[in-house]
């Protein structure tokens, strides 16, 4: 799959990022991960992101990363394209990018660089180096310390033909509008704020109809129903699902920092696809919060 073919795929449909399965000892559990991917693949996501933020990329050792990406690629070879999360320092991101390409990933999600505050030019140099290290398509993720503006994204688009996507995790509407207007159809644009459904209607109005869904990990039917309602401008269904599910879900998620990942793993366990605990420094939901989530999921009916 060449970068432009990937861009076309990412321009339509719902995207998601499966959680990474760990066993009771905290080690990668490939059998559980295969079961998860086989469960999710038929629901109709356009692409899946392996070892992304929700997949706890930040906690994976290099050898584990290779196992996760290989397992995802092999399992989904005939069903759904796999993009691999990459990040960290520039050299580390390049190593991960080249490994993901070697293992057969169709593209990359370039997560924010590690910790260090950096100038726009420095961040752009980081993105360019990663793009030029591979031939597969790259989606850059503007979030946290990565805040590329429209000017630099335009320059990067000229220098890096395989930079084919922009994912927004900032929620800066002025910046999003300027990027969308300046870059036009050069990129595929993805909504990437936590619990992106809450922002989906607003982002669609900005020209960003595609987003990645965390809740697809445990209520895939509900996630697809919501996406389809957004796509056909069914405002009544969108409002009902936000009121009935997403706002109560946010009440639980927002109780502690890091719960954007923890609550997804809890949901997967409730759904019968236990992915094990989150790794430190994240913490799992309390027993009370777990029961609150279980009751909320029960209201959504069979998936």
Curated annotation (Swiss-Prot):
<dbReference type="Pfam" id="PF00701">
    <property type="entry name" value="DHDPS"/>
</dbReference>
<dbReference type="InterPro" id="IPR017655">
    <property type="entry name" value="Dehydro-deoxyglucarate_dehyd"/>
</dbReference>
<dbReference type="GO" id="GO:0042838">
    <property type="term" value="P:D-glucarate catabolic process"/>
</dbReference>
<dbReference type="InterPro" id="IPR013785">
    <property type="entry name" value="Aldolase_TIM"/>
</dbReference>
<dbReference type="GO" id="GO:0047448">
    <property type="term" value="F:5-dehydro-4-deoxyglucarate dehydratase activity"/>
</dbReference>
<comment type="pathway">
    <text>Carbohydrate acid metabolism; D-glucarate degradation; 2,5-dioxopentanoate from D-glucarate: step 2/2.</text>
</comment>
<comment type="similarity">
    <text>Belongs to the DapA family.</text>
</comment>
<protein>
    <recommendedName>
        <fullName>5-dehydro-4-deoxyglucarate dehydratase</fullName>
        <ecNumber>4.2.1.41</ecNumber>
    </recommendedName>
</protein>
<keyword id="KW-0456">Lyase</keyword>
<dbReference type="GO" id="GO:0008840">
    <property type="term" value="F:4-hydroxy-tetrahydrodipicolinate synthase activity"/>
</dbReference>
<dbReference type="InterPro" id="IPR002220">
    <property type="entry name" value="DapA-like"/>
</dbReference>
């Amino acid at each position: 799959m060449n970068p432009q073919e990937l861009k076309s795929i990412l321009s339509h449909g719902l995207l998601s990022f499966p959680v990474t399965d760990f066993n009771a000892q905290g080690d990668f559990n490939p059998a559980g991960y295969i079961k998860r991917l086989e469960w999710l693949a038929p629901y109709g996501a356009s692409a899946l992101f392996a070892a992304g933020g929700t997949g706890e990329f930040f906690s994976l050792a290099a050898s584990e990363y290779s196992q996760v990406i290989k397992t995802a690629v092999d399992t989904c070879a005939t069903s759904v394209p796999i993009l691999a999360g990459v990040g960290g320092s520039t050299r580390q991101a390049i190593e991960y990018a080249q490994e993901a390409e070697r293992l057969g990933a169709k593209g990359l999600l370039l997560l924010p660089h590690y910790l260090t505050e950096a100038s726009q030019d420095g961040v752009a140099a980081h993105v360019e180096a990663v793009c030029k290290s591979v031939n597969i398509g790259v989606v850059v993720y503007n979030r946290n310390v990565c805040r590329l503006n429209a000017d630099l994204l335009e320059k990067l688009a000229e220098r890096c033909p395989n930079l084919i996507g922009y994912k927004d995790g900032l929620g800066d509407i002025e910046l999003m509008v300027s990027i969308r207007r300046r870059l036009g159809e050069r990129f595929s644009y993805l909504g990437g704020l936590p619990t992106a459904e809450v922002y989906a209607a607003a982002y669609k109005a900005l020209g960003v109809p595609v987003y990645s869904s965390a809740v697809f990990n445990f209520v895939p039917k509900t996630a697809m129903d919501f996406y389809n309602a957004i796509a056909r401008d069914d405002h009544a269904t969108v409002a009902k699902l936000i009121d009935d599910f997403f706002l109560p879900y946010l009440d639980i998620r927002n109780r502690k920092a890091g719960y954007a990942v923890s609550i997804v793993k809890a949901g997967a366990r409730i759904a019968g696809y236990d992915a094990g605990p989150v790794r430190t420094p994240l913490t799992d939901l309390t027993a009370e919060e777990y029961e609150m989530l279980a009751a909320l999921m029960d209201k959504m009916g069979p998936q």
